[in-house]
């Protein structure tokens, strides 16, 4: 492998996003069901959309809940034929699975053991897949 020299151009992932149909419903799901913290909620553009970001507590990364307005954006909402749109980490998938189900979160099966840890696939308010993972220390 070639050694890297100089300054790294990419140093962080501060922001990611997910397209949603209804920003209010998405904000409710991500804060009240998943327990993420609302960082921003401000008017954005002339369409009535809002700039909404949420984040796990004490994390630098923010998740934009972007209103799907264009046709290609709308086509991405609720798609479950590809990889999850987000992966969220937890220290205990089984406990999180139980607590989130009690809050009404839909899962596509029970937690499953992988070579790297345990994971479970859940669906957000629009049916977009989100992977909940717990990494193992046994690598």
List the predicted regions and their residue ranges.
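Short, charged/polar surface micro-motifs in flexible loops or helix N-caps
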Residues: 57-62, 69-72, 92-94
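Eukaryotic phosphotyrosine signaling hubs
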Residues: 13-15, 81-85
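Short amphipathic alpha-helices within nucleic acid-binding modules
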Residues: 29, 94-99
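Short, charged/polar, Gly/Pro-enriched secondary-structure boundary elements
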Residues: 58-63, 126-130
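Acidic di-acidic motifs
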Residues: 22, 92, 124
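Short, basic, helix/turn surface patches
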Residues: 64-72, 134-139
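Vicinal oxygen chelate
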Residues: 2-9, 17-18, 39-42, 50, ...
């Amino acid at each position: 492998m070639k050694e890297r020299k100089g300054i790294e151009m990419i140093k962080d992932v501060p922001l990611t996003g997910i397209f949603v149909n209804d920003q209010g419903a998405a904000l409710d799901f991500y804060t009240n069901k998943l327990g993420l913290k609302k960082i921003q909620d401000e008017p954005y553009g002339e369409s009535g959309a809002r700039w909404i970001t949420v984040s796990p507590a004490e994390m630098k990364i923010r998740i934009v809940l972007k209103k799907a307005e264009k046709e290609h954006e709308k086509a991405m909402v609720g798609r479950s034929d590809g990889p999850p749109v987000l992966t969220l980490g937890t220290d205990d998938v089984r406990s999180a699975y139980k607590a989130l189900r009690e809050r009404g979160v839909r899962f596509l099966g029970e937690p499953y053991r992988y070579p790297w840890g345990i994971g479970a696939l859940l669906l957000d308010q629009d049916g977009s897949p989100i992977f909940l993972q717990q990494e193992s220390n046994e690598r």
